[in-house]
């Protein structure tokens, strides 16, 4: 697999099989709203001021710059649980040293509001959130397409979704991973944060490709016979039987890495029949590789063979990255929707665990790329 020579953007496979659904989506502050959910309650004591902000059409970094210029706090002294996109309306939490609180007493900005403040003992760090609630409004939705949207949402709510990295990771032209590969091969870059981001894009690209291969396997296991699976994947009859008897869409593999969902530790799938029950109960999920020296290793069998198909040509760079694991299969929570036939608006709300992308879910529902 020569990533550098590819001229087209890789398109991961969908898990659902319906045809594309017609709807208009614009990622603006009225039609795309994100609300961050903290990982813990704020204590009410300590040296850090927690700001609950609402930003519109600003990146998190742009919001920090505005607050820095007003308060005098250096950008590096702010804390945040995650970066949020520029487009849309975002409610998120930031932290700053409490001693600068008075400088924000008369703060006013057309695109940035401080809604409330809290006191806490520590600075917010990346990952200090449970997840995000999303509101999405689709427009120009005909009644026939509204029915298709409802069915797609019910299917995703029942089976779960592919936890791909979203387009935000890969840049305007979808090729940030190529720059990450160049850096791993020795290209110099002074901007450390950009360097880390591009290498992360490389890891994310490989993750998406492996997950797409697992989605393909799951479709094949549903659609093909044991004999055909044996021929395609060069597996034993017993392995083919194990795939065929799994009723859920996303098939687990013996020897792959699993994790306690949504925050738990990694472990190997040794007893497939036992783990299937926990997977169906949403207590565990399969974890894909973010390549690196410290990532939990896959066992053996088909799981390792499929992983090697994607990662074998990049193992020489393994030592240059820390690595980790990411859930490949996630679940919608608190799902709601409503259709206004008169306005032709279809509104969707749901909660996702941290690290999951609402745009990935929306692309799965609509079966088309959002911003082409």
Curated annotation (Swiss-Prot):
The active site is at residue 85. Coiled coil: none annotated. It catalyses: uridine(13) in tRNA = pseudouridine(13) in tRNA. Residues 160-330 form the TRUD domain. InterPro entries: PsdUridine_synth_cat_dom_sf, PsdUridine_synth_TruD, PsdUridine_synth_TruD_CS, PsdUridine_synth_TruD_insert, TruD_catalytic, TruD_pseudoU_synthase. The keyword Metal-binding does not apply. Disulfide bonds: none annotated. Its EC number is 5.4.99.27. GO terms for molecular function: RNA binding; tRNA pseudouridine(13) synthase activity. PANTHER family: TRNA PSEUDOURIDINE SYNTHASE D. Belongs to the pseudouridine synthase TruD family. This is tRNA pseudouridine synthase D. It comes from Campylobacter jejuni (strain RM1221). The lineage of its organism: Bacteria, Pseudomonadati, Campylobacterota, Epsilonproteobacteria, Campylobacterales.
């Amino acid at each position: 697999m020569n990533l550098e020579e590819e001229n087209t953007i890789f398109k991961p496979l969908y898990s659902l099989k319906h045809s594309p659904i017609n709807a208009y989506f614009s990622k603006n502050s009225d039609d795309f709203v994100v609300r961050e959910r903290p990982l813990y309650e704020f204590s009410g004591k300590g040296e850090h001021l927690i700001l609950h902000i609402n930003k519109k059409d600003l990146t998190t970094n742009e919001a920090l710059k505005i607050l820095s210029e007003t308060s005098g706090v250096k950008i590096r002294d702010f804390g945040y649980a995650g970066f949020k996109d520029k487009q849309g309306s975002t409610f998120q939490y930031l932290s700053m040293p409490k001693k600068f609180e008075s400088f924000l007493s008369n703060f006013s900005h057309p695109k940035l509001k401080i809604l409330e403040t809290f006191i806490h003992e520590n600075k917010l760090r990346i990952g200090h959130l449970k997840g995000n609630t999303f509101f999405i409004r689709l427009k120009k939705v005909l009644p026939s397409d509204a029915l298709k949207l409802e069915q797609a949402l019910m299917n995703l709510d029942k089976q779960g979704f592919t936890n791909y990295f979203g387009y935000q990771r890969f840049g305007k032209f979808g090729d940030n991973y190529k720059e990450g590969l160049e850096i791993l091969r020795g290209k110099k870059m002074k901007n450390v944060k950009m360097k880390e981001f591009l290498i992360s894009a490389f890891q994310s690209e490989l993750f998406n490709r492996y997950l797409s291969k697992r989605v393909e396997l799951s479709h094949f296991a549903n659609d093909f016979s044991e004999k055909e699976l044996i021929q395609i994947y060069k597996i034993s009859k017993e392995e083919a039987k194990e795939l065929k008897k799994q009723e859920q869409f996303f098939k687990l593999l013996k020897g792959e890495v699993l994790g306690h969902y949504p925050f738990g530790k990694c472990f190997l799938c040794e007893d497939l029949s036992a783990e299937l029950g926990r997977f169906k109960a949403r207590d565990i999920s399969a974890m894909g590789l973010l390549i690196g020296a410290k990532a939990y290793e896959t066992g053996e069998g088909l799981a390792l063979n499929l992983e090697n198909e994607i990662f074998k040509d990049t193992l020489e760079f393994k030592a240059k990255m820390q690595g980790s694991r990411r859930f490949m299969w996630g679940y919608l929570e608190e799902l709601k929707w409503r259709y206004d036939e008169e306005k032709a608006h279809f509104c969707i709300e749901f909660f996702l665990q941290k690290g999951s992308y609402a745009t990935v879910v929306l692309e799965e529902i609509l079966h088309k790329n959002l911003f082409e």
